[in-house]
Structure formats: C-alpha cells, structure tokens
Amino acid sequence: MSEPLLHLTGISRSFTAGDREFLALKHIDLSIQAGEMVAITGASGSGKSTLMNILGCLDYATAGSYKVNGRETRDLDDQALAELRRDYFGFIFQRYHLLPHLSAMHNVEMPAIYAGTPQVRRHGRARELLARLGLSGHLGHRPSQLSGGQQQRVSIARALMNGGEVILADEPTGALDTASGKEVMNILQELHGLGHTVIIVTHDPKVAANAQRIIEVRDGEIVSDRANPRPADEAPSEPPVSVRPAGARRLVASLGLFKEAFVMAWVALVSHRMRTLLTMLGIVIGITSVVSIVAIGEGAKRYVLKDIQAIGSNTIDIFPGASFGDSRAAAIQTLMPADVTALNQLYYVDSATPMVGRSLLLRYGNIDLNATVNGVSHLYFQVRDIKLASGISFSENDARRQAQVVVIDHNTRNRLFGPDVDPLGQVILVGNLPCTVIGVTRENKNMFAASNLLNVWLPYETAAGRVLGQRHLDSISVRIKDGQPSKVVEEHVKKLMEQRHGTKDFFTNNLDSIMQTVQRTSRSLALLLSLIAVISLVVGGIGVMNIMLVSVTERTREIGIRMAVGARQSDIRQQFLVEAVMVCLIGGAIGISLSFAIGYLFTLFIKEWEMVFSMGSIITAFACSTLIGIVFGFVPARNAARLDPIEALARD
C-alpha cells in the first residue's frame, strides 16, 4: 500500500482558558490516502473542526506527528506552512469567506496570486473554473450580488485555483437551501471523481453519506472509522492526478506579488473612500505645509538677494581710511582717477568707476531742492546696474570734454518737473552750473534703498572740475566679472591698491558677505519653519498608524481568508505596508498639488515676488511620504502578519 497523503500519529491539541487547560484532540491516529472522499462527523464541540484545521495546516498540534505527502509539519515555520496550504489544500467554508470588495473572478484568483502565477495564466484558469461551475456570466459580480449557492461555487473554484489536491470542506451545505446543498455535494463528488482528495467536516449524516469513508469524532477522540461503499458507477474511475498550475519563477513571482500588492491595496483603499480620505488628511496638510514653506522661503530669499544685487552684490567699494567712521579718512586724499584706470585693467574686473559726491542745491524755475550730486564715470550705471526709464547716460566723450549734462533719478524728476513736463532737454542749475537733463533713471523699488532720496549724476570730470573743485576721489566702485569669486577678486584689488599707494590707506566693502548672511539666515528660517511643518507630518503619520491599526482590526477575517488560501506572513505584511505607503504617496501628491495651487493664488495677490518650487523639495516631499508610510505602517502591518489564521477566520 502506498504512503498516505495525510498521516497523523498521536496528535493532541490543548487549549488554555484562564488557569485551566483542556484537550480538544486526544492522541488522534489517522491516515488518508490520495483520492479518498472522507467525511469527519461529530457533534458541536467534538473536535472535528480542530482536526480539520490541523489537517489544513491552519492550526498546529500540541503533541504528535503530522505528515503531508511524507513531509513532517511539526517543525515547519509559518512560511513553510503557508506554502503547504497554498500548494496542497483548497478550503470551502460554511460561510463562503469571500472578500466582499472583490469580484468573483478576483476572489478565485487569490490563491494563484500568492503562488506567483503569471496574470494571463491566472485569469485564464479563473475563467475556466467559474465557467465549469456555471458562473461564466458572473465573473465581475461581487459576493453581495450572488446567491448563497453561487457564492459557495465561487468558494469551490477558489479552492481549485492552485490545483486543490486536498479539498477541505467545512459544513459546505450548512448555509444553503436543499437544492443548492445538493448541487454543491454533486460538485464535490465530481471533484473526487477527478482524483481530488475530498475531506468533508459535517454534523449532518446525509452529507456524510456521500463519502466513501466516515470518521466520527467525539470528545476529541476518533470513536468510529468505517467505510461507506458507494455504487460502482459513483466510484472514482481515474487515479488521483495533480491539476496544480505551474507557478512562475521566483524572481518573476516576487515581482508579480509586489505588483498585485499594489493592485489589492488600491482596491482596498477605493472600497473605503472616506476612511482613506481621513487617513491621508494629515499627510496632505503636512506635505502642503512643508512644500509651501520651502517655496515661500526660497521666493523670499531670491527677492531679497535680487534687491541686494540691485545695489551691487557683485561690487567692491573702496574708501579712504581704515574703516567706516575713521576720523582720519577726510584727510586722506590718495584715491585718484589713475587708480580707476589701473583697476579696469585687472582680468577679474568688469568695470570700475570713480565717485565724488556732495549735497548741493538744484534749481529749476522757481523750485529749489537739495540733492546728492554724484560725479561718476560713464561706466557707473553699468557698475551699479542702474537702468534708465528715458533718455541716455553720458558717454566717455562727454566726460573728456567736461560736458554740462546730468542724469536725474525718478524722485528728482517728480519733484522738479512733476508728471506733466518732459525733463529731457530741460536745463537745471546744479550748484551754480547749468546742466542739460539727458536721462532719467527708473523708480527704485529696492527694499534696501531709501525711497525719498534725491540723486543726480554728472560726468566725474565735470563734477570735479566745474562743481566741486577737487581732483581726489571719495570712493571707487568696482564691478566683478560674472562667475569670478568675490573674495579672490577683493584680495587682488587690495594687493594692487597697496602696490600703487605704498601703504594700506584704504578699506574695502564687499556686499557679497551681506548676501551670504542673508542666504544663511533664510536657510535657517526655512529649516525652522520646515521643522514646524514636519511636526504636522509626524502627526499625520500617527494618524495613518491609528487608522491602519483600526483597519487591521476591521479586516481580521480578510487576513484569515488570505492566510487560508496561501498568503505568507510576509505577504500580509507587504499588503498592509503597501497600503500605508500608497495612502501616504497619494496624500503627498495631493499635498504637492495643493502647494502649486497656493503658489498660483499667491501670485494673484502678491505681485512683488512669488513662491519658488524646486524639484528637490518635491522629491523630498515624496521621499518623506514614502518614509512615513513605511515607518508608521510597519506596526499595523506587523500586527496583521502575526494574526493566528484560526482566530482571524472566526472573527465576525
């Protein structure tokens, strides 16, 4: 006689209730050959269901040995037991145990998903099984749209999906009417005829009468094991055969499982829209806060830096004396036009301009104003990046011939001429020198500039020779070439000036240091605000964990069903972890979209500057979403994977 397919020796199963321990099974010895149709009967509480659970590797024995096709199960871990359930057993439950949010076809496919069967083959087999059971027109129907008999046929198809070498049917007709029950028993007999080993657990003698062999269990012991010969025409006409579909290779199977985890996660999330929305709300708020704050900070930084650049962030100013406030500075008259010429020869220097200035009286008609009169070179407007609103600036030729021309600023234009008079070509008195207005600068909206100051500019030669009567310079302004390091250029300027003067009787002022300070400050502020926003992300993550823990509790029976059809602990853990990550990623995407919407509204109401979104902040936001999903989804996923399949299936 061949080795039994299922062989139990001395199997006992005890349970603890408080301080008491009781035996549900007592020293069970049982062998079941491949291809048998066996009925296990007994009253409620007799131990028959516990025996079925041990046979199906859903439960474990406290003592004894249980072999499946010669393989000892006693020392197998949870993963190996899951593989045994997946490869050998198909379960048919009294209450069908179909997942309500999946269609009939997807319910049937579930065991093959965990077996790693390719999608095309999986779909084909599910259709074939459902068609064989008369459900070809109900592939897309959910359990709530099917009758009890139809649901049980879906359950049978699911049991056969991976071959179902052993069919374990727990009260398969218990929830059905007589006609549907008879139909299900006919299907089980057909499966037996095809070579499947069919084990029926029932308390109904009429159902048990369909089996070849009837085993009666009472008080945890087998009290009867008798043959029940059927008419010859009903006996199996073929030897047992394996109809298990070939699985995919390991790598392909793993990738397929990961893909299916995403599909199943999406179905689960869509099936509970309100819960999903509330779960991701905290993530949406957190991501929106982080991305928006970073964008506002970057926009503010660029706005400030732009204003600094407008007053000369890439310029170096040279002044007489040791530093600002030096009492000896007025007596030092060593800055000369020749220094400007020498500085213009340096490779690092884009342009340099002399500067002299005094507060003098301006007069036009009967209007007198005090303004700062600046004597500069024709390069001054390039050095300071000052744009003209109208007219032109003076030329090098104007400087050589000490032309009596002047460029005025926007404030001076308004004060002297008003809005209705074109100042170009008008003659004004600068001190006692009549000068023709040839240009007007744009209005200065720089946040670092005093908005009410009046400035006019003359060629340096004109100002020094005809207005101020001095040859030395008050200061020199040097514009650095683009791309050149400011500190390096500053050192070369200092070295050249010391060589020319023979001593260090000057000091330099470089606005680049101010720019760096602003950048550091803005980074610190953005970091501070981001940390505050991250707190909301953490709160959102805790919300995800709480809802996922609730979800695990609500879906305990689903977890038990998945384990019964072959899901390993790692599959369950991956399923819930993927759900948590998906919630956070969707929340992150919504949060980023909201940030862009806020940025658009921001530009409508605030014209001076705008929010600046960077790819780095968006990638960081998605990375944070993923990390939060993994970190805060791990505990619920771990709890789900650790559930006992028997307890999970028993949960309502």
From Swiss-Prot:
Entry EC number(s): 7.6.2.-
Pfam families the record matches: ABC_tran, FtsX, MacB_PCD
Domain ABC transporter: 6-244
Regions crossing the membrane: 251-271, 277-297, 525-545, 586-606, 615-635
Membrane topology reported for the UniProt record: Multi-pass membrane protein
GO molecular-function terms, A-Z: ATP binding; ATP hydrolysis activity; transmembrane transporter activity
SMART domains: AAA
Coiled coil ranges: none
Description of how the protein assembles with itself and partners: Probably part of a tripartite efflux system, which is composed of an inner membrane transporter, a periplasmic membrane fusion protein, and an outer membrane component.
PANTHER family in the cross-refs: MACROLIDE EXPORT ATP-BINDING_PERMEASE PROTEIN MACB (PTHR30572:SF7), MEMBRANE COMPONENT OF TRANSPORTER-RELATED (PTHR30572)
Membership in a protein family: Belongs to the ABC transporter superfamily. Macrolide exporter (TC 3.A.1.122) family.
Chain's role: Probably part of a tripartite efflux system.
Protein name: Probable export ATP-binding/permease protein PFL_2149
Organism: Pseudomonas fluorescens (strain ATCC BAA-477 / NRRL B-23932 / Pf-5)
Source taxonomy: Bacteria, Pseudomonadati, Pseudomonadota, Gammaproteobacteria, Pseudomonadales
